[in-house]
């Protein structure tokens, strides 16, 4: 099971994207645990996950969050703006899987 966490300004704007990612995972038979949180809770939700994704609106924090994630052995990157804006769960799931390796 892939444990993916999305972090944005308040944790609310990514809720629809989370649903679309879960639907995409179910369609391809991938087991996932995907939850969105506000970025100020990043440290509390880093342990035991496979990937951390940042919403574009907090992309300015990328270097800081990647440093924390790297220390925990977790890949972290900013969700591409187009996929985020279009709520393309399939593409964002593929992006996360590529980060995980």
What are these regions (language model features)?
Residues 46-51:
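Short acidic/histidine-rich motifs immediately flanking catalytic phosphotransfer sites
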Residues 19, 23, 67, 94, ...:
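Short, well-ordered alpha-helices that flank and scaffold nucleotide-derived cofactor binding pockets
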Residues 2-39:
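Conserved active-site segments centered on acidic
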